[in-house]
């Protein structure tokens, strides 16, 4: 039976990237790692083997969707918490790109740089969660959003979370500071317990914000859907990954489904932020080309039907008369 902080049972079910760097050393190969019971098959493209093909494609889709959400947020120039939520999406984009590099096998398991890539991935995951937590305070107006205090507090907190998770992960993989592949309690606490507490606090704060300060209750639906997608992804990854993989002949596994659910959860974060944020249209400048309604031109016979054309003192312009230079024109002038 696995003890607290042991990744053996987790890695046997879920094909996590860190599983290749934790666990006992295998006598046959002399390498450290825990192999999952089932994982998605690799695909070959242009003489290149791509690991976790389905999950890799989903990472690309997540990158595209994140860019779209960032563009929508950037178009709201006067929205509350605009800079703060952009930091969250930028970090999520970095995490998705790093996950694509690791899952696709650009940094293959067993290589020398692999533990460093996985440590960066773990650090970015903690930074994303911490950044989301700090975003939760913006709606309470404890401090002015968009100010150096707000932005730099978020950046420093996210950087601290990244550094802690990165160093603990690397120390675990490299057997530094009393940690090691078989002593993973610190890694488990940083990656799972601490992040879970931050997510719980964020959700509780947003529910309190909507129920106490907003008249509209529709944002609660966005929160509920976000929780559902995130929890569903974790359950599919850590409880049913191997069963799903075996049932569909190694074409997909829980990593693909977790990536889909995480993307949907992030999209719900954007939808929630958009629903509680009102833009000051008086001072906003839209980036779309159809901000102003363009009417069709009037017919020629109705174009001059105005009060100005009936003024007896109005002087006709040369643009109102047809161009016909003749003798009469020059004789009148000279």
From Swiss-Prot:
Any GO BP: protein folding
Its GO CC terms are: endoplasmic reticulum membrane
The places in or outside the cell where this protein is found are: Endoplasmic reticulum membrane
* Keyword annotations from UniProtKB, A to Z: Cell wall biogenesis/degradation, Endoplasmic reticulum, Membrane, Protein transport, Transmembrane, Transmembrane helix, Transport, Virulence
Q: Which GO terms describe its molecular function?
A: unfolded protein binding
Q: How does it sit in the membrane?
A: Multi-pass membrane protein
- Location, primary (coarse class): endoplasmic reticulum
Q: Where are its TM segments located?
A: 49-69, 85-105, 123-143, 159-179, 185-205, 220-240, 244-264
| InterPro entries found in the cross-reference section | Chs7 (IPR022057)
Phenotype of gene-disrupted mutants: Does not affect conidiation nor nuclear distribution, but leads to increased hyphal hydrophobicity and to reduced virulence on tomato plants.
Function (record text): Chaperone required for the export of the chitin synthase chs3 from the endoplasmic reticulum. Plays a critical role in cell wall integrity and virulence.
Q: Which family does it belong to?
A: Belongs to the CHS7 family.
Task: Indicate what this protein is called per its UniProt record.
Answer: Chitin synthase export chaperone
* Lineage summary: Eukaryota, Fungi, Dikarya, Ascomycota, Pezizomycotina
